[in-house]
Amino acid sequence: MAAAQETSLRADERLVLEWHGDNRNGQTTDDHYGLALQRLTLTGSSGALRTSAQIDGELFWDAPTADYEDAGRLERVAVEYDMPLRGGDLTVTTGDFHRQLGRGLVLSLRRVDEVGQDVTLQGGQLAWSGDTLDVDVFAGRTNAAEFDAVSQHAVNDPHDVVAGGAATLRQLTPLQLSLGVFGMHMRPRESLVPAYGQDHMSALGASLEGAAPSGIAAFYVEADWQGRHVAGDGTMAKALYGTLDLNLGALAVQIEGLWLDDFFVRGSRNSAVGTAFDYAQPPTLERIDQEVIDNTNTRGGRVRLSYALLDGDLVPYANLMMRQNDPGEDTQLDQIHAYGGAEWSYDGGRARLNLSAGARDEVQDGQTFKAMKHAEGDWLSPIGGGHALHISATHEERRLESKAYRRGSSVAGLEKGGLGAVSVEVGYDTSDPSDEVRRLFVAGILAWEPTDAITLRSTVGSQRGGLKCVAGVCRDFPEFSGARLEIVGRGDLL
C-alpha cells in the first residue's frame, strides 16, 4: 500500500494602515490621505506538487489625486511539479516565477522589497537537474506588481515577451569547475517608434566558476554579448564580469572587475515612474547602499582586504572601488570610493559593534562633480533579563558641484527577545534649504510580538526620504509624516 502523501497549506497575511499628513517636501500631491494595504500569500504542497498564490489590495481615503487607485487582484499564482526523468529530476513550473541568468547582466527578474520592485515572468519553465548537468528553458511575459510601494500609484503590467534557457556542466576536475551557457530573447510590448517595426533584443552569455579543493581560492568569470534592434537601428553590446576570492589564513582578499559596453535590457514603460522597466541588474562594484545612477556603460574594479583577529571575533577591513562611467566620451565620470571599518563580536556572540567610514569622489572634466564623506555604526549589547540596547547611526557630508549639505539618521532602541522593541529614530537632510521643507525628522517605532504567529509594528512621526539604493536598484522615496501600523500574521492551515 502506497504511503500517504504529506500535504501542507500555509497562509501569510500582511495588513498595513497608514495616514499621511503634510510631509513638508514642497509638494501637495502626497499629503493628507489614508491608505490600507493587504497582502495574503498562500503556499501549499502535496507530495511532488507545490502551489502558491498572492492576493493584493489597496484602499485609499481622501486621496489627493486620481493616481491613487483602489484595487484588488490575484497578483501572483504558480504551480510546480517534480518528477524523475532520465537519471535526474525534472521540475515543471507554470504561472509566476523569478528568473536570473548568470550574475544578472543578461537577465534579472527578481523581487527587491526595499525599493518596491517585483517583476516575475508569467509563463512556464522546464528545469532538469542531473548529477553533473543542469538544463532549463523558459518563456512567458513580464508581470510587474501592480502597486508601486514607493509612489503608491498603480502600475500597468508591461507584458513584454521573454524566452530563454541555460545549461550548466558541474564538477569538472580538478578545480570543481562549472561551465555555464545561457541566452534570452525579449520583445517589448511597446516599441520606441512603432512605424519602424517591433523592437527586440537577444543576448548570449557564458560563465566559468571554480574553487580550489583546499578552499584557498575561488573565482567566477562571465562574458556576455547582446544585440538590440530599436527604432529600426541595430546595436551590439558586450559585457565582462569577474570575481576572485582568496583565503590566505587570517587574511581574506576579494577582487572584482566589471566592463559594460552599452549593455542593458529595458522593456516597456513603467506607468508609475515614467521610465522603462530594467530587466537586468548587473553587479555594480559598489557597496550595497550606494547610489548608482548609471550602470550600462562603465568599467572598473574593486578590492577588499580583511583580517581576522581574536579567533575571528574582530575583523578589520578596507575596501577600494574605482570605476568610469562613459569611458572615453565627453561625459566620462571618474568615481573612486575608499572606506574601511571593523566588525567586532563579543560576549559569546551576544553583542556586536560594527564601525565604518570612508570617502567618495566623482570627477567629470577635471572638476569634482560629487563628493561624500560618510560614517556608520551599529551596536547591540545585552543588558540582562533578555533585554538589549541597539543603536545604529549613519552620517554623510555631501557636495554636489558647489552645493554642500549633510544627511543621516540614528535609531536607538530597547529590545526584548520574543516580545518586541521600542525605538526612537532621528533623521536629518539639509539638501533643500527652503523654509517650507522639513530638515529634521523624528519618529517613534514600536514592535510587538504578542504570539509566535502575529507581529505588529507601528511608526508615528516623520522619517527622512531621498534616494535609496539596494544593489544598484535606486528609487527616490518621499518623506513620511504621519502614522503607520503593520500587522503580520502567519499560520499553517493544513
Give names to the regions the model predicted.
Residues 280-281, 448, 462, 477-494:
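Outer-membrane beta-barrel "beta-signal"
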Residues 1-6, 492-494:
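Cleavable N-terminal export/targeting peptides
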Residues 409-427, 439-461, 485-488:
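Conserved C-terminal beta-signal and adjacent last beta-strands/turns
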Residues 90-104, 120-122:
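Well-ordered mid-protein domain cores that form the structural environment of catalytic cofactors
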Residues 104-105, 305:
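Short loop/helix-cap segments at secondary-structure boundaries that form the rim of catalytic
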Residues 107-112:
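"Short basic amphipathic alpha-helical interaction patches in structured regions
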Residues 4-36, 43-74, 81-90, 114-408, ...:
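Signature for the C-terminal beta-barrel architecture of outer-membrane proteins
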